[in-house]
Amino acid sequence: MSSDFPHYNFRMPNIGFQNLPLNIYIVVFGTAIFVFILSLLFCCYLIRLRHQAHKEFYAYKQVILKEKVKELNLHELCAVCLEDFKPRDELGICPCKHAFHRKCLIKWLEVRKVCPLCNMPVLQLAQLHSKQDRGPPQGPLPGAENIV
């Protein structure tokens, strides 16, 4: 083969891994991105678990207001923030059937574990489960859609 092309030398130069800095950077950068994405997914999972545990911590129901319902003992405004209820508001309903904005009720229950209107205790789930094992489970509230 060298006789066909006498002026050309067809030897491949010896290139070691040390002479390819771009490959090293690609591997390191790719690994760093992979670890970053994994840690981001793990953080999102932990945040989701925290929100789920926070929802289940108190024994109130979460509903989305579709229309005015008399059975829920709804007043025209939230007793915590004093704003009117609007359609599609997320409501928290205490066992005593008093309704509040969900965020208002969460903030209230972090300070006091009672209904803002009637001071009836809003039990934590551990206490509620022991009582529900003896009685029949409650169905969804009329006129309201449960949030999943």
From Swiss-Prot:
**Compartments, as annotated in UniProt:** Golgi apparatus membrane
Give me the segments passing through the membrane. 24-44
User: In what way does this protein cross or attach to the membrane?
Assistant: Single-pass membrane protein
InterPro entries attached here? HRD1_E3_ubiq-ligases, RNF24_RING-H2, Znf_RING, Znf_RING-CH, Znf_RING/FYVE/PHD
Q: Which key words are in the record?
A: Golgi apparatus, Membrane, Metal-binding, Transmembrane, Transmembrane helix, Zinc, Zinc-finger
- Entry's Gene Ontology molecular function annotations: zinc ion binding
Query: Entry's Pfam families?
Result: zf-RING_2 (PF13639)
The segments annotated as RING-type zinc fingers are: 78-119
SUPFAM superfamilies per the UniProt record, alphabetical = RING/U-box
Q: Gene Ontology cellular component?
A: Golgi apparatus; Golgi membrane
Q: What does this protein do?
A: May play a role in TRPCs intracellular trafficking.
The name of this protein is RING finger protein 24
